[in-house]
């Protein structure tokens, strides 16, 4: 099942966004302190214990400044995620999109399909907002001051 987010114009150049998402340790650095326990990462992978499940994600492909692909690495189901960093009309902006390919059974597709799309769209909207200096609702700005 392939699910694509909407496209958003992020106020950062493609290379800036690419560099943020290429190193999995950056994801840990963005977590609040109380969520970092049980999370381990290096440049190519991240593993965490979430509600009793071991979940891992690894980088499978890096196309400099245009695409990064991730895949499950010990998750309860198979999935892949592709982040697309396309040049925009402005060299200091990026058209950003997330595409998820998840191996879900019929029931899980029915339950989660729309929720995954909504979550992906929210991530894109939040990234756009943050790139323009607006902190998305529910995000604590102090998380980014460290």
Where are these regions (language model features)?
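Soluble, non-transmembrane catalytic domains of enzymes that act on hydrophobic metabolites at membranes
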Residues: 1-2, 7, 75-82, 141-146
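Glycine-rich portal/gate segments that line the openings of hydrophobic small-molecule binding cavities
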Residues: 28-29, 38-76, 145-146
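Intrinsic-disorder/low-complexity, polar/charged segments enriched in Ser/Thr/Lys/Arg/Asp/Glu/Gln
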Residues: 2-7, 45, 54, 67, ...
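Hydrophobic pocket/interface hotspot
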Residues: 17-21, 27, 59, 70, ...
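Generic structural detector for well-ordered beta-strands
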Residues: 7-11, 58, 84
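Hydrophobic ligand-binding cavity/cleft-lining segments
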Residues: 1-40, 146
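Beta-strand/loop substructures that line and gate deep hydrophobic ligand-binding cavities in soluble
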Residues: 75-125, 129
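Short, highly charged C-terminal tails/helix-capping segments
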Residues: 125-146
